[in-house]
């Protein structure tokens, strides 16, 4: 009886964690888009608020012994903090300038770029099956972007820069975690305030401080509430991702990611009336097929690697 109650409690915690991640990951996209469309809130300032809220959330977490901070030299994570700024700023600019469908599909291109970076600069090898899955992923993104009736050059530039900087950031995060022997929360705890400091210096040069569109402008209570809510949700996204990776299998995490991808796309078309042509639909289907194939082959290779290790004498 005690075992069954323990299993039930454990499953309930996992379901709750997945639900928090689902709601926060989807809400952050829609709320940010809503803030850009209806209030025109400055992008870099919103990113700065996200960083500050994330650090405050992590500070509370470490006080509650959810994780133990590890002392790190600022010089060791300087480049990582800069790339973190670029990754979030350009990703948000892509969301601001593109439809949610194009924004979501552009993010998928992070996988092919990471593979290219790891192949060229880290001498990492990938199987032919993995490389072939990049064809439908890339083709689908191109199809969707080409037939997007709201296509704009600046949006594509922001999306491209977002993909490049995000890919570099993700590669460097993995390398730094291994080099410094820290987990993602310990790294983010030091990285978030450094990134906040960088943006605090840059914001006055790129965005107005007062008047319409400025951080100290005449914002309504609802606009400020939405911005603060966005910051809280940004923290929940980071926290729930860390929790899911630590408490579920890679299959659960990846399959759940595909579910969120589809829900976010659907929500963009429903909430913001983003137009969807037949060719765009084919592009989305093509990309999703590539993502599923990539996940299947990647997980199969990981399981094969584990079985080889266990079979060694």
Swiss-Prot record:
GO CC annotations on file: Golgi apparatus; membrane
A GO BP entry: transmembrane transport
SUPFAM superfamilies: Multidrug resistance efflux transporter EmrE (SSF103481)
Cystine bridges: none
Cellular localization per UniProt: Membrane
Molecular function per GO: antiporter activity; nucleotide-sugar transmembrane transporter activity
Keyword terms, alphabetized: Membrane, Transmembrane, Transmembrane helix
Topology of this chain in the membrane: Multi-pass membrane protein
Biological role stated in the UniProt entry: Putative transporter.
Recorded family membership: Belongs to the TPT transporter family. SLC35E subfamily.
Protein's name according to its UniProt entry: Solute carrier family 35 member E3
Gene coding for it: slc35e3
